[in-house]
Amino acid sequence: MHIFDELKDRGLIFQTTDEEALRKALEEGQVSYYTGYDPTADSLHLGHLVAILTSRRLQLAGHKPYALVGGATGLIGDPSFKDAERSLQTKDTVDGWVKSIQGQLSRFLDFENGENKAVMVNNYDWFGSISFIDFLRDIGKYFTVNYMMSKESVKKRIETGISYTEFAYQIMQGYDFFVLNQDHNVTLQIGGSDQWGNMTAGTELLRRKADKTGHVITVPLITDATGKKFGKSEGNAVWLNPEKTSPYEMYQFWMNVMDADAVRFLKIFTFLSLDEIEDIRKQFEAAPHERLAQKVLAREVVTLVHGEEAYKEALNITEQLFAGNIKNLSVKELKQGLRGVPNYQVQADEHNNIVELLVSSGIVNSKRQAREDVQNGAIYVNGDRIQDLDYVLSDADKLENELTVIRRGKKKYFVLTY
C-alpha cells in the first residue's frame, strides 16, 4: 500500500495543501520532511505522539525526517487557538526542555541507521544570530498584515488581544520551513491541525522568496470529552515522561478509552497492520465486554513509549490491585499504581489503633463511621480485611518500612506513610 493511502486509511491526514502533487512526490523518490516541537514543558505529551508516529511511518517508508525542536520559537510562544498568551520562559529553562524533548524523540525516530536516518535541528541556530533589521528586511517583507490577520488562529485572539510577539510567531515558523528547504531540501511539513495557518505561512514564504513548492500534512488533534485539545496548557495531559505520567497511569488511560474510540486509536497510535486491526475489530464487536481493543491499545502504546518491561509492570500492578493483592507488589510498584490517591503522614507519636487512624487520616469522618466500617468488613490493611476494633498497626504493616495501604470498600484506596 502506498504510504499516503495508509496514512489516509489510518485517519492520520486531516488536511493537505495539494494531495495529488504530494502523492506524486512520495511515489517518485525520497522526500525530506520535518515536524516541529516547541519546548513548552520538559516533556512531550500524548497530543504530540500523533505527529511523531506519523513521522516514523514515513521514515519506515523510506523518507527522511527532520525533527525540529524550537529553541527560538519556544521563547516566543505559539498563539494558535490558545485562550491567553503563554508565559514567557527564560532561555536556560527552554534549553533544558529542548534537551529533554530531543531525548524523547530518539525513542521513536531512528537517528543512527540508513541514508534516511533522522536529523535533529534547533531553530535557535538560525534565529539566534539574525538581527531584527535583517528579520524585517529578509523575511517580514514577504508577509502582509492582511495575510497574517486572515489566519484563524489570529482572528480568535484579535478581540481579547494578541501581542506583537505572538503575532509574529507564524513568520518564525514559516522561516523554519524556508531554512530547512534551503539547507536540507525539506519539502514537506507535518503538524497538528491547529498549526495549519503557521504551516502554510511556510509554503507561502517558499513560493514568494524562492519560487518553490512546499507541502503540508496536518494530522488530527486528539480531544477530550469536552472537545479540547490534549496539551499542557489545557491541563489533563498524558505525558511521555514516566516521571510525569507513569506507565501504569498511561496503561489505565488507554484501558479507559471509550468503545467508540478504541479501534480508531489502534489505527492512529499503533504499528499493527490494518488487517490485524480489522481482525481485532471483529473480535471486539463480538464481545465488547472483554475490552480486547483497549487491552491491545494499552499494550502496544505503553510498550512503544516505555518499553516491554514497563508494560509488564503496569499490567501486573493492574491485576494485583484489582485482586486486592497488595503484598504481591513492591513499594515502587505501589507508588506507581497508587499515585494520586489520598496520602497521610503518620506522626511518630500517633496512636496506631485502626479506628483512630481511620479518623485522623481523613479516611472517614467520625469514630462511629470508622467502627461501623471495621465491623462490616469494609476496611482492608495491605489487602487483609480487618474486623477487630482493637487492631493496632505494627511494623509488620509497614511495607518495606515505608507505607501502609488502606482500602475502604472495593475501590477507595488510601496510603499511610511514615
Swiss-Prot record:
Predominant location category: cytoplasm
Q: Name one GO molecular function term.
A: RNA binding
Name the Enzyme Commission number(s) assigned to this protein.
6.1.1.1
Domain S4 RNA-binding, by residue range, is 352-418
Known Pfam families for this protein? Answer: SYY_C-terminal, tRNA-synt_1b
Q: What does this protein do?
A: Catalyzes the attachment of tyrosine to tRNA(Tyr) in a two-step reaction: tyrosine is first activated by ATP to form Tyr-AMP and then transferred to the acceptor end of tRNA(Tyr).
Q: Specify the protein name.
A: Tyrosine--tRNA ligase
Species whose genome carries this gene: Streptococcus pneumoniae (strain 70585)
